[in-house]
């Protein structure tokens, strides 16, 4: 005991010593346990990472709960905090008593806060009111609750409101309650921070205590305040200047509190810039204070530790204060660069010794309490030396990133200061070290400081920071900023390998056992450092990939089973957002990891390839310098992946990909892409792009394709394919970012374009085997794998995605690149026979649209990308057509030209040898070589008298019309048509010969050159000259082409042959003549493969197909009807003639038509059933248009109505309200409910017996039994097409179902085939012949599932079949609204031949069409027309048209007149000769004069606007251009319909 202590305090001191000894004994055991537990945490990690996910939190919680007991003066507060924590931790165990106590305590605290604020509101308006007790009480409440909150070990870098970070904490709730008191907050931030507050109240009292409490309370509630809003309002009234003065020179703890407020204010960049001058003056002073506080703390701590067992607490305090006195007269440690900072000149009103005495007095009390257990934070009250240092560090941290303060850091030796704080850290108290590390991280963003830090051994000091501890979070920030500086990382990578190994081990430890913010920093550290090979190798050596993968494998947002636990209160929007950020960082790190491995692997491959090359390459450089960073552009990466794919075995293994697959990383990445559809955050594009880039690199190993084809479990328990997610990203469904689209296309290209036959050379990346048997097995496996990839891509609508991307025009800067990549993917996909067959029928190829795209780039600056698009477009055309692509004119490679070139190339050219000899003979005679000519005549047996040579103009026909003024057709003219056939001809040989210019026309013995074609003179070919040099190509067969190629882009050079070089075959007369005849053959409009012998004297021309007499334009209806008796089938022309004419017959309207809107209709015998917008079903008699009866069927619009053939059952459907479909029976003139189908949006009857109903619910089809109402079968596709307007339908025999583009077998319930999707709306219908399916514009063959043809006129049109073998196509209702901008004929319907889908007519009704129905025998059609306008009231009614009836003159005159008012019964009764309609049209009159006579008005009368064909009456849309000819004879329409019905 010290002798200076008074006798009155002896007993108290002795009691205090005994209590402290007892406390030390109790806490020493806990300290040992903590140390032992910390030692265990440093052991190697377990293999199962998910079990380690929350180790740090559990350990910290255990230390918090068992850390020790507080001093006697804080027993109440600490006990309350511990009781709340225990109650919250044990709530799951069902401790009702603890829960009740905690709830009572929270309620009491809330009540206490409310009472204090209410009391303040009542008294604060009184004169002389003292707010100090109120502020003190509030500060104590918030300090107590903040202590409880901090003991839960929240993330120190989490800047969210405490209530959002932990909704169960009382601290956050109290903050919300306080901030609702705007009056109090205004007083606190404005008035209570004034030095003259009491003097303004006419009270003679110092405001120092009030200012201290105000600063203290503001700092305690700062986590719930918006810093920018608070200090920007305080900037104008001088509050910040006052705080600067307090921070610079004031008494403690006001000086420290003011520094803390400045630290928060400097986080706002605008404030930091505005107060730049004050900061420049204050920063050196703060650094000096830190030097002094550090020196005093270390010295005092050393003395206390050495004399702890010999000296009392008072003597320790005396020793500490003596150090303060000495330090106050001493200067701070000087920097080698600068001696003194000039701060000593300013005098202080409050001496440093007195200030620090207060701080260290409080530090002694805090140290005696907390030296045996882990300290979670540094309290603000009472203010200690650690509190002051913490707040100064925060102030310096907020300014550390500014360049102007970097010089001050060097001048004041900040690095030595930081090193002093980080040396010999105590595991139980690293709170101050955490603040120091944050300050260090702010300085490490400067390259100069980072390099200095590394050179002075800073990295070694960082790695000595104990873990687990709060300072570990600071280390994660520091190493991230170090990795951000590449020069610093290069120096680190050149250090000793054990140090690098320890760095990687430390970062991996952070990945597994720290807060989320620390994990993010560690992940970003790895993503920046993977480019250095030494880090990459060490990462793999320590199983880093598994630990990195485990960071996201335990996240709830990626776990489909998480949806089962909807009551998980820990999972909220903030947690979900934080998890998405974590996924983003991990995906970026995985991308950098795989790209770095790929870079070094590719350079290793280059080293093997160029091993024999003496010249140094970049590959040698990188392999000899493993610390050099590896960087690749997007295009370089894709090209190198393609190269490695060609040299990698089909069964190859690669350690990074193998490990990622073993961990399930490929599936996880696909799940991330699929789940990101529903994510709405700024980093979604980067997340998806990074995941796709990882998959792109992994595609080097073909086994990855299997994972992409497998099914994934989604959050809604549905399944999808990996390729479905990739295709969705390529289509822009996830993000419209061009980089995401290109990354997705890269994955598709690497998969569908993967080589089947891979190079098995010595430069292969990895060789699986060399035996012939293994090669065959590998080849078979490769084919099966690639075919599986093709099938998966097609099943997920890959064709339509790639086709749409090939025609994209935006974003304009990347459109050319996207088109090129999409074209390459489709070209690779076209290696599949199925895809090739489908693509060949699409308009993009069949109509020449691709050639249009190939002409010009979208952006002229992107011509390089456009050239790539042209390259793959030609490759695609070659594969689709099966023909060789022409080389001379690559911009016009239409399928027809390629087909023609292939026909010409396959033609065998034969000619008469005697004619050739005769030409040679004449040539020799004309050149004076008579003896040679006579010798030739004798040897070949030519006749003695030379026949007269026939000139071309004597030909019975001209095969090529010459332009006016042209005297001859030169050989170049002949060649002009060969541009499309050169490649096909040249493709059969390995020689590409060329020779000189064409010779002049022949002389007297030649043909007449006046009007015909001049034959080249071959005498200029001297066979004794040096042979022409010919370059060999890769072709295997012999070519007949000797056409000149020297001036063509792809031509071969011409030169003299050298000795010992190539030995080409000589050009012969036969090849010259053969090419000449081939050129003639290429001019034919319809070339054929098998040709007769060519005549050298006459130009060749293949015969044109002769038009059939039946199809002649002069073959009219009368003669055609007569030829029918002779056995000719003329029904097609009759059908086209009849369905060219439509005449309105009757309009059906209700009596209250102004209030009713018709939506749909169905013709049933002599009645017509109509659905309305009001949900009614109404029945009208077609004879008189009178409404028979009606019933309310739905609460909303009736979208579809259909009656069975018997007319006693009606099914109605409404899309918007439940029940959506109802089956009604019609009896006694009323609708009677028979069956409700609540979830079925569309329904139709079966075709044969009509005892079943087929309902549609989204992509699912369900079959119901009408009699029992039970469900017979359900058909849900595995991979749905998701048509927006799917309507399931049955075939004519009820054996097949088509729903959502999937064909089903009704009896077995199995999927038969999934048709490719080429539109978003219409799923398709069966053709009545049961052999074809029409899905929008595509016609599919049910026997082979081939695409037969496309019918563009049916685009977005519903098909209705007539018994007369025609198809009516119309855009109905919602379909019209869906594509209003793209639909061509919204007010018309098309009539097509059901046999060949040729267009018969397009009938414009000049009004929108809501529905269309056909009668049982096809003689009538009913159209629901919408007569609504922009300014007129909407009016709809049903107009019935008579098929085959020509419009009268009256109807043409009234075509544009207003719609007349209806009669009293609400219908148009027509003329006196209106006919009654029975089941078989027995009362239908004979329309004898269809040409339009004067009594047309007596035969057929209409009162409304009528339909008008877009085509003329006498010219239909026949493809052959024929005229149906109705000038002679009569045509009985009734007989025609009766005959057709009997044929059916």
From Swiss-Prot:
Task: State the residue spans of region: Disordered.
Answer: 1-110, 946-973, 987-1059, 1447-1475, 1487-1544
* Major site of localization recorded for this protein: nucleus
Q: Which residues form the LisH domain?
A: 912-944
Instruction: Show where the record puts the motif DWD box 1.
Output: 1302-1309
Pathway per its UniProt entry is: Protein modification; protein ubiquitination
Function, as annotated, reads: Probable substrate recognition component of tsome E3 ubiquitin-protein ligase complex. Plays a key role in cell competition via its interaction with l(2)gl.
| Family per similarity comment | Belongs to the VPRBP/DCAF1 family.
Annotated protein name in UniProt: Protein mahjong
Q: What species is given as this protein's source?
A: Drosophila melanogaster
Q: Which gene encodes it?
A: mahj
